[in-house]
Amino acid sequence: MEQKQPLIIRDKNQMRNWSRSMRSQFKLIAFVSTMGYLHQGRLSLITEAHKHANVVAVSIYVNLGQFSPNEDLSTYPSDFEGDVQRLLFVPGGVEVVFNPKNLYDYGESGGSDGGVGGGEVVSCVEKSGLGHESWVRVEKLEKGLCGKSMSVFFRGVATIVAKLFNIVEPDVVVFGKNDY
């Protein structure tokens, strides 16, 4: 059964205001973070989110911070309109889709030296000169598993998840097995 069209929010302040509006109505907010190109596994997380909250927010954001400069970010699949259409058929629907352009963009005031010193790992974000300087590190994960071959992956994921939590301010978050 098709649901109503979700509200699309691209501005982080508007997203935060939406969440606070829901909270003022005593609604619990569940959040599912995605990079888009939604498949049945991700859609099932949204169905699960409905079991734990009154409203569901989904982010669709390709995180530059988890890609190394030598990875081809342009080949990452993207179909925003298709994703929104798929969300219409999730039982219970989705109230809001947060689709920011760039959560690392600091405008003119950000630094533009294009990287970090001392031979540290560099992601697409630093290489682009956006001036992002604060990162959330998960050192144990960075040293093992795929952390050795994907030097910025866990740092980028942990950082963006922290940013999204601070913007969306969810009561409940639903992750899948591949998110750990």
Question: Where are the language model's segments positioned?
Answer:
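Nucleotidyltransferase catalytic core that binds NTPs
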Residues: 1-180
